[in-house]
From Swiss-Prot:
The lineage of its organism: Eukaryota, Metazoa, Ecdysozoa, Nematoda, Chromadorea. Disulfide bonds: none annotated. PROSITE patterns: CKS_1 (PS00944), CKS_2 (PS00945). This is Cyclin-dependent kinases regulatory subunit. Belongs to the CKS family. GO terms for biological process: cell division; regulation of mitotic cell cycle; regulation of mitotic cell cycle, embryonic.
Length: 94
């Protein structure tokens, strides 16, 4: 758990069989800048001051707590075994 100089809270990482996850709590001022109807690209969330290693994907916003951003990235071994018929694996805004 880390709180940077920007007062963001970074959760510990956790995982399932396919992904590594973490969530980031941003300040109320930054939360106002988050798009309401779509997920952000890595360039967008980095421009808000979120700092993480490459490969993290913003995959969900929890509607009641818009200041909590959820990120995931495939586990190295899971990339070989992920099933699906193409398309995007983005979950979206809830």
């Amino acid at each position: 758990m880390t709180t940077g100089s920007n007062d963001f809270y970074y959760s510990n990482k956790y995982e399932d069989d396919e992904y590594e996850y973490r969530h980031v709590h941003v300040t109320k001022d930054v939360a106002k800048l988050i798009p309401k109807n779509r997920l952000m690209s890595e360039t967008e969330w980095r421009s808000l001051g979120i700092q993480q290693s490459p490969g993290w994907i913003h995959y969900m916003i929890h509607g009641p707590e818009r200041h909590v951003l959820l990120f995931r990235r495939p586990l190295p071994n899971a990339q070989k075994t992920v099933r699906g018929g193409g398309g995007t694996s983005a979950v979206g805004v809830r």
